[in-house]
């Protein structure tokens, strides 16, 4: 028999639930899991919420080593997390990039471009939440361009990035 005390932290929405309780948060939260496409799936859901709710959305993607038997199916060698605050209106001096999602080019069969840095590419491939690294790299460089993110192979998610001044 499985004890509830052994099970309660194994569900993927436990983090969101605990944070909501501790912070007294009354706003909705959504938890998405899509294997290696989880970051892109979360980003897509966050953008849809942003459009429908017309209020800021905090996207948090995180992974840590999975317990058995999940570890055998998808080993995660380290912990990784990223948070993006998405808004519909830029905030001068605070907004660092504009992300665009175009309907006809939102999904693509184009390949994900590997990271130039071998260590970052290894991290990107080995941890689902780290699939955000190409997007973060483009934002950090202050460059405009298109990033292709792992989603469901295929298609992949295409995101256009423009720096804000």
Residue ranges and their predicted role:
Residues 2-6, 12, 16-29, 61-165:
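Conserved "HGTGT" condensation-loop signature of ketosynthase/thiolase-family condensing enzymes
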Residues 10, 36-40, 126:
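Short, conserved micro-motifs enriched in small and acidic residues
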Residues 32-57:
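Active-site-proximal alpha-helical scaffold in enzymes
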